[in-house]
Amino acid sequence: MKLMFASDIHGSYYYAQKTVEAYREEKAEKLILLGDILYHGPRNDLPKDYAPKKVIELLNGIKNEILCVRGNCDTEVDQMVLEFPVLADYGLLRVRVDFLH
């Protein structure tokens, strides 16, 4: 199983698009998002192409391929608009590793 990990999109449609493009190009089976999906946080500048509604639409389009844990900028409101579960501050993932020698 090929997994792709990404984090800290912070509502940037530009970076969300780049993430999904890389995910598709790599032909990964799951996209693991490590939090900070929509909101940029009060301490951060607005990210490039800040458009959380467009990010929502893009990610909801591949909702069955996403596993996500909550970041420090994610809120319960995010879960109301995202159609995939934003898990607690951690997630458990069973991974089988095979070695060929």
Protein language model annotation of sequence segments:
Residues 2-96:
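Core catalytic region of metal-dependent phosphoesterases/phosphodiesterases
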